[in-house]
């Protein structure tokens, strides 16, 4: 199983993008320049028609991608053309994986250099079949923990976790306001008592000030909605500058 610590030094810069937004050409050009960016780990969002965990901005981006005919096949074709030293993670809804075929999907993802899967609506209790395939192909199925997750459930969730722990820093959908820093610090301390895996904080991280605050709390910071907003500009040079700005030290 991949050790995500090898992709960053002090703290991980984790970004999220919707593949095919605003179009596949810009997605591909962005991925071609990924190694020149401050991003250490990139979450690749696969557009889905019912994105229950996503806020309006990401849901709208997914709809634009879908309206252009972007699907799992075009995503795979795009990734087959990409070579990068950075860690790539799929953020994908379970129905897409199930429809494609669990083993077939995981095997294909592995062949394209995907290190891990984030499946937001898949509960721990329903994950056995996918866990089995991920273990077979040495891909991490990322564990999500919320600040409101009870301690005993945290212990249960992280016991067999792989890759990293995704700590949801806000309650609800992506792009919403982050909870108080002290609450997050307590949750990180609690998680650390059960696992040595790196802990990355996401949901509600909106600007460089948020990034700097969260770096003091966890091992990495995940920026999603703000980065998806940048892509609306459809100018890759400006997008890259904005990404540099939000992740600056």
Curated annotation (Swiss-Prot):
One of its GO terms (cellular component) is cytosol. GO terms for molecular function: tryptophan synthase activity. The active site is at residues 43, 54. It catalyses: (1S,2R)-1-C-(indol-3-yl)glycerol 3-phosphate + L-serine = D-glyceraldehyde 3-phosphate + L-tryptophan + H2O. It comes from the Bacteria. Pathway: Amino-acid biosynthesis; L-tryptophan biosynthesis; L-tryptophan from chorismate: step 5/5. InterPro entries: Aldolase_TIM (IPR013785), RibuloseP-bd_barrel (IPR011060), Trp_synthase_alpha_AS (IPR018204), Trp_synthase_suA (IPR002028). The alpha subunit is responsible for the aldol cleavage of indoleglycerol phosphate to indole and glyceraldehyde 3-phosphate. This is Tryptophan synthase alpha chain. It comes from Campylobacter jejuni subsp. doylei (strain ATCC BAA-1458 / RM4099 / 269.97). The gene is trpA.
